[in-house]
Curated annotation (Swiss-Prot):
This is Glyoxylate/hydroxypyruvate reductase A. One of its GO terms (cellular component) is cytoplasm. It comes from the Bacteria. The active site is at R227, H275. Catalyzes the NADPH-dependent reduction of glyoxylate and hydroxypyruvate into glycolate and glycerate, respectively. Keywords: Cytoplasm, NAD, NADP, Oxidoreductase. It is found in: Cytoplasm. Belongs to the D-isomer specific 2-hydroxyacid dehydrogenase family. GhrA subfamily. Disulfide bonds: none annotated. SUPFAM superfamilies: NAD(P)-binding Rossmann-fold domains. GO terms for molecular function: glyoxylate reductase (NADPH) activity; hydroxypyruvate reductase (NADH) activity; hydroxypyruvate reductase (NADPH) activity; NAD binding.
């Protein structure tokens, strides 16, 4: 079995060594420009078109939860990866736990009004504030994939009303489900904290815009853990400046690294991290990929295959 590997920042020798340990008999090599030798599987992140084009592969694995970089290239180069070759993404591999930690910590930060107390501290003011009630602090999650389900699960013990919005109806315990465009408005009108975990598709690009934000209750919060392209940053800033939004926590941006001239840097009610909410953990990802390849080789069912029409 021949496997080609391409990632510009991962420790490639480590990945090759560990994959070969978990897949006895496999030969894993780093792909470099000009390598046209046969391969059975490709493990990639933002691959050049020539890496995949014309290859008779059994499957391609994206080394992350998102596959938008591959799908965007396919629009211009449809022969890069024929539909007959399945495309897989990392379903969890430790990312679910990281998203849980991030989401719970930020929701609690806002619920306990630590943002307000930090502002008072900077103003040298000693002022106890009224508490928020958990049963009135509704958290709405946009996106009902593996990560959205994990985040909802982690928030349940805290007593917040939970709701989810997705393409199709979900039956999650203790979570109110809204589905499709027809129910988006109702979902938003009752949401105090909006958590975005949507996939990056043509339908979701720019979804967090002026129209959407206007439907949230006054003094709501936005937590973006998905993709920067989901947020129209000018509309987000306008909502913050008008008081419609009380705060925003952003892990992803339309341009990364975030340009120095971006007004997001200096805004007092914007907090941010540099796209680190959930990173690929090598050993968990390697084990998932090795197990999935082994199941494919045995002809057994697997999960994680991307529906290219939907984009996730």
């Amino acid at each position: 079995m021949e496997i080609i590997f391409y990632h510009q920042t991962f420790d490639t020798p480590f990945w090759i060594r560990e994959l070969e340990k978990q897949l006895p008999g496999a030969r894993v090599r780093e792909w470099k420009a000009g390598d046209n030798q046969p391969a059975d599987y490709a493990l990639v992140w933002h691959p050049p078109v020539e890496m995949l084009q014309g290859r008779a592969l059994k499957a391609v694995f994206a080394l992350g939860a998102g596959v938008d970089s591959i799908l965007s290239k396919l629009r211009d180069h449809p022969d890069m990866l024929p539909l007959s070759i399945p495309l897989f993404r990392l379903e969890d591999t430790g990312m679910g736990r990281q998203m849980q930690e991030y989401a719970v910590s930020q929701v609690l930060h806002w619920f306990r009004r630590f943002d307000d107390y930090q502002a008072l501290k900077l103003a040298s003011r000693w002022q106890p504030l009224p508490e928020y009630r958990a049963d009135e602090f509704t958290v709405g999650i946009m996106g009902a994939g593996v990560l959205g389900a994990k985040v909802a699960e982690s928030l349940q013990p805290w007593g917040f009303p939970l709701r989810v919005w997705s393409r199709s109806r979900k039956s999650w315990p203790q979570v109110q489900s809204f589905a499709g465009q027809a129910e988006l408005g109702e979902f938003l009108q009752g949401t105090r904290v909006l958590i975005n975990l949507l996939p990056n598709t043509a339908e979701t690009a720019g979804i967090i815009n002026q129209t959407l934000l206007a439907q949230l209750p006054d003094e709501s919060y936005v937590l973006n853990l998905a993709r920067g392209v989901h947020v129209v940053e000018e509309d987000l800033l306008a909502a913050l400046n008008s008081g419609k939004l009380k705060g925003a926590m952003l892990d992803v941006f339309s341009r990364e690294p975030l340009p120095q001239e971006s007004p997001l840097w200096a805004h007092p009610r914007v907090a941010m991290t540099p796209h680190v909410a959930a990173v690929t953990r090598p050993m968990e990802a390697i084990t998932y990929i090795a197990e999935t390849i082994s199941r494919l080789e045995r002809g057994e069912p697997v999960s994680g295959q991307v529906d290219r029409q939907r984009g996730y």
